[in-house]
Amino acid sequence: MIQLWGDSRLRSKNDTILKAIKGESTSHTPVWFMRQAGRSQPEYRKLKEKYSLFEITHQPELCAYVTHLPVDNYQTDAAVLYKDIMTPLKPIGVDVEIKSGIGPVISNPIQTVKDVERLSQIDPKRDVPYVLDTIKLLTEEKLNVPLIGFTGAPFTLASYMIEGGPSKNYNFTKAMMYRDEETWFALMNHLVDISIDYVVAQVEAGAEIIQIFDSWVGALNVKDYRYYIKPAMNKLISGIKAYYDVPIILFGVGASHLINEWNDLPIDVLGLDWRTTIKQADKMGVNKAIQGNLDPSILLAPWDVIESRLKDILNQGLNRGKYIFNLGHGVFPEVKPETLRKVTEFVHNYTAK
């Protein structure tokens, strides 16, 4: 295992977020926004008039530009690589496309263990060189904040692959778990294997933090999570850490009932959505760094409302330490860029030491 937290590997001048994760003293609370690269930026919307999401991510210069924009425009303390959690699925044989207004749509959903056996492994240098080239390009451009790479969690990826797209109830996914454990665990193991290779390649290319998005896992109860999901998550996170001791953030939506399960995992940061306060997480015994958790909808409110909510969350974060400010989900397209800029400035000033 290679230690990435030391000065010898640290490329970023602004290492505030890395210090916060470790519980070290920082000059201010670090800020970044999920989906900060993309939808709310006018420059990005102009690009989208010409290119699809996958077309942008396949062109390292464009992708690096989109990734870098919020760091320049909002002065965030981290950059998050612009790509989709579906990115590693196409190379392994999943026919996926992103449809406007719908999201990922998969034409060959997984139904049997034979479908899983037909999936290939991933060779990131061969299959997703554009992702690695984008990371290297950002590093060469001397990005002055840590770059966050990411992957989808096995359950969330599997739910898309089984349902064929977004779902409200995950009926097909749960049905497979309950009636066909052979196929379910084969799929989990395959997704863990490709995700480890995919994440390790991102770290080797220059990513300094990894976020695992388990967007839909809140659909499961605790008992099912422990049996059907948690072993795969342990294997994924431990597998990454066997190569590099890179900081790992875990985030999901509507999953407050799983906080204790997440706290058991070898992650470094637990991402909260807006439904659970930092105080509540602390009372539940969370001993990781915490990230979150302003309701994204608040950013559409008048500034006095935003400021009031910011103060409440920031005070909780300041009281506990080991805290990163973020939203409780991704930035909405309707949010004005100047609002994000103002939020970052407020967080930096309000928490300045």
UniProtKB/Swiss-Prot annotation:
Annotated site residues (Transition state stabilizer) in this chain: D84
Binding sites annotated in the UniProt record for substrate: R35, Q36, A37, G38, R39, F54, D84, Y160, S215, H329
GO terms under biological process: protoporphyrinogen IX biosynthetic process
Subcellular localization, as worded in the UniProt entry: Cytoplasm
Pathway as given in its UniProt record: Porphyrin-containing compound metabolism; protoporphyrin-IX biosynthesis; coproporphyrinogen-III from 5-aminolevulinate: step 4/4
Molecular function terms, GO-annotated: uroporphyrinogen decarboxylase activity
Keyword field: Cytoplasm, Decarboxylase, Lyase, Porphyrin biosynthesis
Single GO cellular component term: cytosol
Reactions the enzyme catalyzes: uroporphyrinogen III + 4 H(+) = coproporphyrinogen III + 4 CO2
EC number: 4.1.1.37
PROSITE patterns to which the protein is assigned, alphabetical: UROD_1 (PS00906), UROD_2 (PS00907)
InterPro entries for the chain: UROD/MetE-like_sf (IPR038071), Uroporphyrinogen_deCO2ase_HemE (IPR006361), Uroporphyrinogen_deCOase (IPR000257)
Domain of life: Bacteria
One Pfam family named in its UniProt record: URO-D
Function: Catalyzes the decarboxylation of four acetate groups of uroporphyrinogen-III to yield coproporphyrinogen-III.
Classification via NCBIfam families: hemE
HAMAP family registered for this protein in UniProt: URO_D
Subunit structure: Homodimer.
Similarity comment text for this entry: Belongs to the uroporphyrinogen decarboxylase family.
This protein's name: Uroporphyrinogen decarboxylase
Species in which this protein is naturally found: Staphylococcus epidermidis (strain ATCC 12228 / FDA PCI 1200)
Lineage: Bacteria, Bacillati, Bacillota, Bacilli, Bacillales
